[in-house]
Design a protein with these regions (language model features):
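Active-site catalytic motif of lipid deacylating hydrolases and related acyltransferases
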Residues: 1-53
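Catalytic histidine-centered segment of alpha/beta-hydrolase-like enzymes
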Residues: 39-40, 151-161
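Catalytic histidine neighborhood in serine/cysteine hydrolases
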Residues: 140-156
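Conserved alpha/beta-hydrolase "acid-adjacent" motif
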Residues: 128-134, 155-156
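Gly/Ala-rich beta-loop-alpha elbow adjacent to hydrolase catalytic centers
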Residues: 59-68
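Conserved alpha/beta-hydrolase fold motif
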Residues: 58-59, 79
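Short beta-strand/loop motif that positions the catalytic acidic residue
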Residues: 121-127
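Active-site nucleophile loop of the alpha/beta-hydrolase fold
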Residues: 7, 30-35, 77-91
Length: 170
């Protein structure tokens, strides 16, 4: 079972979800309201889902990548990050999120425990939201990281189906 976590303002039926379904994967993809629920509660909900549905792989896109990375550090599950927003306390206010950033900063510190050997990551070279992903590259130095020329922030601009197929062996 794959737990797919969408990004800020995104949909449970995002590009990652669509690509996974096309490969015949068993996917759980919750719709999350990041504006209405505090980050700690989002993480708690996702943790419970991962355990309850016996997730064996996590996939997170953008802000969902932040939560997938946190769960990877905690649960030690293989994780695929798609244009991850690993510093949401910096990015989300620029996107209109008005929640306090301190809870995100507390959660951010937990990324230090991530085992990058469990992580695969695909990023767009022309990501207009995150930028050059310099922090992602440094944090995940041992990860399998693919940078897509001309790829933007939207997962629709990335070859997700073939990328997932290679990693998941589908």
């Amino acid at each position: 079972m794959i737990l797919n976590i969408h990004g800020y303002g995104g949909s449970a039926q995002n590009s990652a979800y669509t690509a996974l379904l096309s490969l015949g994967c068993d996917v759980t993809s919750p719709q999350l309201d990041y504006d209405a629920v505090c980050p700690e509660k989002v993480l708690e909900t996702l943790r419970e889902m991962a355990v309850t549905c016996h997730a064996d792989t996590l996939i997170g896109t953008s802000f969902g990548g932040f939560f997938a990375a946190l769960l990877c550090a905690e649960l030690h599950l293989p994780t695929i990050l798609v244009n991850p927003c690993l510093m949401p306390f910096d990015i989300l206010p620029r996107l209109g999120n008005t929640q306090p950033i301190q809870p995100l900063m507390v959660l951010f510190s937990k990324l230090a425990a991530i085992d990058s050997s469990l992580v695969h990551c695909i990023i767009g070279a022309e990501d207009e939201v995150i930028g050059d992903h310099a922090f992602t590259k440094r944090l995940l130095c041992d990860a399998d990281l693919v940078q897509v020329p001309n790829g933007r922030h939207s997962g629709a601009t990335l070859p997700l189906q073939s990328y997932f197929q290679t990693i998941l062996g589908k």
